[in-house]
């Protein structure tokens, strides 16, 4: 079989270890007939799109600068204000109003996400077909074909996991999810033109993901990753993916099993491997912060993915941003874990407060871009954002959530306490500063019993009965509410800008709203709103796939469609190299006495 090797974001990342094989022109056909070629194709098989911005603007983390809102900083004069800012992309306006995002097909659009993830599926299927057909001959490289096949299955499972969570309703339970439209689960290369697909249902897609995931886990090792294991589904990343999958499926014992495979159970060891905030002391530019966050050698980072994404530009100085109430809920609020500061000190240390100099919103150094010039004279090229797709910090919170839902409250407290200690793992000098000025301390049981028991505090609810709308089996008992409030607060901070907040809102059944424009029009998403599943690309609908927002068709009732009819090659757009990010003055967040 043959495939054209895409020379995109993944190849950009791997340029330091590429050889003549990867330097082939994009349209040159290469036969996949050796272990080396299988492994090299897998190097570039990871999705080049990012779900970060698409999901952030669809969540409660983004507000409209042009709608009346109070300043982000509680220390500022509290008067309602609104601006007259333009959008970075017309699709942002559509998505913020929970409409189909159809005006753009370039990076950070639903169409680009759809096509890049199916392109990744396409490449994984080529590797699997070559191996399964027995067409791969030994070349003395020492690469293990079983490991290559396992990696391909993990890529395919991951791609469909993201696709179904973006373009379908959240998983509810085995029966209820049969009534929700899924996504095509593609298992053969495009060359098999006789194979056609429908969207099936969410339950079917989850079953197929689980099969690929379990088969991938059974065969994966780090044997084939000789230079850059964290750009692949290494063993730890595979277990982290499994923990996330089973959390979304609410198989909590398996969440803990796979989290333990990575984290272990020794608190001192886990703490030592969480994010190290000390290197931020020497950072000043967004690029400096990005290097620390995205550090390949960081023990906290389990898997890093290179993407075409302009996420920092979308949210910096334009209409839709982390501003006003969302900014307060995530960053700008007091807490018993820090006092005398109106902002989370971890945000001040870790570079979460990049802005334009006006209160138009904030972005974080963790999503700062790396620029690839295509025309230095014109100053244009492609923006790459490195995603920290799986981290120990997030995995620790996933384990804590599973422990809460199993009634293991002591274990959940220990994990959340450990997470908050990790949030404060500053250099000694920086820690002394914030401990004395902000009176920093980790989560305590008193905080759980007081602060997190009050629904008036950010990210806290009086009860979590809304989860039962998703499934009668999804019950958060009264004694677990304060733990889930704490988990929600910590997790919302941890996954900020990653896109995962949108998935959390969906899977928990949380109702939320967007306020739009100077007239303050309110758009609300209830737990079962069809718009909680983003609309698939117009071209896929025209080919015959069911729309996500269909209310008349049952899953699988539309005609079946060939892969090349609902997929097209994704094409990123070149942009200018300049951006206007600068770090805010943290002194403005000291609470005035």
Where are the predicted features?
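Sec-dependent bacterial lipoprotein signal peptides
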Residues: 1-16
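Membrane-proximal, proline-rich intrinsically disordered regions
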Residues: 17-74, 322, 331-332, 509-593
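Aromatic-residue-lined binding/catalytic grooves and analogous aromatic/hydrophobic interfacial grooves
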Residues: 18-19, 220, 235-275, 585-592
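Hydrophobic-face positions in mid-chain alpha helices that act as interaction patches
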Residues: 58, 256-393, 417, 423-474, ...
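Alpha-helical solenoid repeat scaffolds, predominantly canonical TPR units
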Residues: 205, 212, 219, 258-261, ...
């Amino acid at each position: 079989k043959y495939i054209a090797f895409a020379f995109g974001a993944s190849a950009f990342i791997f340029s330091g270890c590429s050889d003549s094989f990867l330097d082939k022109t994009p349209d040159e056909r290469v036969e996949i007939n050796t272990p080396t070629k299988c492994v090299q194709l897998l190097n570039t098989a990871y999705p080049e799109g990012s779900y970060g911005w698409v999901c952030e603007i669809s969540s409660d983390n983004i507000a409209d600068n042009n709608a009346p809102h109070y300043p982000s900083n509680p220390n500022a004069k509290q008067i309602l204000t609104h601006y007259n800012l333009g959008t970075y992309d017309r699709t942002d306006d559509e998505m913020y109003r929970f409409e189909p995002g159809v005006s753009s097909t370039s990076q950070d659009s639903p169409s680009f996400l759809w096509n890049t993830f199916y392109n990744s599926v396409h490449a994984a299927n080529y590797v699997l077909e070559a191996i399964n057909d027995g067409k791969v001959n030994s070349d003395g490289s020492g690469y293990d074909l079983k490991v290559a096949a396992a990696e391909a299955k993990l890529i395919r499972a991951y791609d469909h996991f993201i696709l179904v969570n973006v373009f379908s309703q959240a998983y509810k339970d085995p029966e209820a999810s049969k009534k929700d439209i899924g996504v095509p689960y593609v298992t053969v290369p495009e060359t098999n033109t006789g194979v056609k697909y429908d969207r099936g249902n969410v339950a079917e897609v989850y079953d197929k993901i689980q099969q690929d995931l379990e088969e991938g886990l059974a065969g994966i090792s780090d044997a084939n990753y000789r230079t850059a294991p964290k750009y692949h589904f290494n063993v730890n990343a595979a277990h982290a993916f499994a923990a996330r999958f089973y959390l979304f499926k609410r198989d909590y014992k398996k969440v803990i099993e796979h989290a333990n495979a990575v984290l272990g159970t020794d608190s001192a060891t886990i703490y030592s491997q969480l994010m190290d905030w000390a290197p931020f002391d020497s950072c000043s530019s967004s690029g400096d912060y990005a290097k620390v966050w995205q550090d390949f050698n960081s023990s906290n980072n389990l898997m890093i993915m290179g993407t075409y994404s302009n996420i920092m530009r979308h949210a910096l100085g334009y209409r839709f941003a982390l501003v006003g109430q969302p900014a307060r809920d995530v960053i700008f609020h007091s807490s018993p874990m820090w006092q005398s500061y109106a902002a989370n000190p971890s945000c001040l240390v870790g570079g979460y407060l990049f802005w334009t100099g006006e209160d138009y919103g904030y972005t974080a150094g963790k999503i700062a871009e790396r620029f690839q010039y295509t025309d230095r004279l014109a100053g244009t090229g492609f923006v790459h954002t490195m995603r920290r797709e799986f981290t120990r910090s997030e995995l620790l919170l996933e384990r804590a959530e599973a422990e809460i839902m199993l009634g293991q409250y002591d274990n959940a407290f220990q994990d959340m306490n450990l997470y908050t200690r990790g949030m404060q793992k500053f250099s000694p000098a920086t820690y002394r500063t914030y401990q004395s000025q902000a009176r920093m301390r980790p989560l305590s049981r008193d905080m759980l019993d007081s602060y997190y028991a009050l629904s008036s505090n950010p990210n806290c609810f009086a009860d979590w009965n809304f989860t039962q709308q998703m499934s009668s089996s999804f019950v958060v008992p009264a004694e677990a509410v304060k733990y889930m409030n704490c988990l929600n607060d910590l997790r919302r901070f941890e996954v900020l800008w990653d896109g995962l907040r949108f998935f959390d809102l969906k899977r928990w059944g949380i109702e939320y709203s967007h306020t739009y424009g100077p007239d303050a029009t309110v758009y609300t998403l209830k737990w079962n709103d069809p718009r909680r599943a983003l609309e698939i690309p117009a071209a896929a609908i025209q080919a015959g796939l069911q729309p996500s927002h269909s209310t008349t068709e049952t899953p699988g009732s539309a005609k079946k469609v060939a892969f090349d009819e609902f997929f097209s090659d994704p094409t990123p757009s070149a942009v200018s190299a300049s951006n206007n990010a600068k770090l805010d003055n943290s002194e403005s967040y000291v609470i005035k006495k």
